């Protein structure tokens, strides 16, 4: 009989189960309390109950645990400095959606060479999340598929659904199941309506299929996630200006949704010129000083060193520099946080 299935696949390895990985890297009671408490603080900000600003900041993607931990340690000092005005959360992205092809992140390819040691990548990701949370820094990530979230979601305080997947039904269903607040980015063309539709969908109960913690394919019923929100990330043109924020809030109001959102300083809003994140920051700070309550949070891409680098076989990487989108350096990060905290003073 002719084979009609698995004609274009080759098995690489057996995947570890979420339960097995969690047993190797368990969550302590103190970390569990930290994650729970940080989620509650973020929820209050998104509901307008807390006038502080959510700040999701960090490298475009994680590729070096040592550099990531150095960044996290410095970020914790900034958290303590600005805690009265800012709820700072570290961006810890392990999966990268690609427009065509490219490195897909630490979980898929931790060795950066196409060897796809996924079990090792999952181990590194969970280990880093534990260490960052143990420092007292909450973590944020993008949920890209139905499987990998089962390995790390218990350590995530804020999640994102990316511009390429906001319109996807299965991602909306997954968001309705997640235990953390979830932001939906507007489409790559700048369309914010798809993000509003995603918020509405994720607030509802859904049935969806996913592996459970033991790897058994399972039928889940979700209760819905009441903390979905828009991430304004720009598109063909930036959408961080006051009129863009007002238009998005009008759409939210139309559907009786909370008129609070997050502005991404990077991506379409900086037109892929990373230093423009500082210009976006200045504009957002002015909007906050002018009395805007719609801006509940911001996202920014920063690392220890400025810019980005390419992976070149046989050549060492520059420590603390991104291998995906270009980032601001640490000095600019401190300036950005100082400006945001000063602007939020006007809310008190």
Where are these regions (language model features)?
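Glycine-rich loop at the start of a catalytic domain that most often binds anionic cofactors/ligands
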Residues: 65-77, 100-107
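Acidic (Asp/Glu)-rich catalytic clusters
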Residues: 46-49, 76-83, 129-136, 221-222, ...
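Gly-rich Lys/Arg/Thr-decorated short loops/hinges at beta-loop-alpha junctions or inter-strand turns
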Residues: 17-26, 222-234, 317
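Active-site-facing alpha/beta catalytic cores
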Residues: 2-6, 85-240, 244-245, 267-268, ...
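Conserved, mostly hydrophobic/aromatic
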Residues: 58, 263, 329
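Conserved phosphate/anionic-ligand binding catalytic regions in large, soluble enzymes, centered on
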Residues: 54-67, 325
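Internal helix-turn-beta structural module
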Residues: 303-346
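N- or domain-start disorder-to-order transition segments that initiate the globular core
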Residues: 5-46
């Amino acid at each position: 009989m002719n084979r009609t299935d698995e004609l274009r696949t080759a098995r690489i390895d057996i995947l570890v189960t979420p339960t097995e990985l969690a047993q190797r890297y368990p969550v302590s009671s103190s970390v569990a309390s930290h994650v729970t408490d940080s989620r509650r603080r973020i929820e209050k900000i998104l509901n307008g109950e807390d006038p502080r600003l959510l700040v999701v900041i960090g490298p475009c993607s994680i590729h070096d645990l040592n550099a990531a931990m150095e960044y996290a340690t410095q970020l914790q000092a900034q958290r303590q400095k600005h805690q009265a005005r800012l709820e700072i959360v570290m961006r810890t992205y392990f999966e990268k959606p690609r427009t065509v092809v490219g490195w897909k992140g630490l979980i898929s390819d931790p060795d950066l060479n196409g060897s796809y040691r996924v079990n090792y990548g999952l181990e590194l990701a969970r280990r880093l999340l534990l260490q960052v949370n143990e420092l007292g820094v909450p973590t944020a990530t993008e949920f890209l598929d139905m499987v990998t979230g089962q390995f790390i979601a218990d350590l995530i305080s804020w999640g994102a659904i990316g511009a390429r997947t906001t319109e996807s039904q299965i991602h909306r269903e997954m968001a309705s199941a997640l235990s953390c607040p979830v932001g939906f980015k507007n489409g790559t063309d700048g369309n914010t309506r798809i993000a509003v539709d995603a918020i509405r969908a994720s607030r509802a109960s859904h049935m969806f299929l996913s592996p459970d913690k033991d790897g058994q394919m399972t039928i889940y019923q979700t209760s819905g996630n009441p903390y979905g929100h828009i991430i304004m990330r720009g598109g063909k043109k930036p959408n961080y200006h006051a009129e863009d924020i007002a238009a998005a809030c009008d759409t939210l109001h139309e559907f009786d949704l909370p008129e609070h959102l997050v502005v991404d300083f990077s991506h379409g809003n900086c037109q892929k010129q990373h230093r423009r994140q500082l210009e976006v920051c200045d504009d957002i700070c002015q909007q906050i000083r002018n009395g805007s309550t719609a801006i509940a949070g911001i996202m920014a891409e920063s690392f220890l060193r400025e810019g980005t680098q390419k992976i070149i076989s046989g050549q060492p990487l520059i420590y603390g520099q991104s291998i995906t989108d270009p980032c601001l350096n640490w000095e600019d990060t401190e300036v950005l946080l100082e400006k945001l905290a000063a602007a939020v003073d006007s809310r008190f």
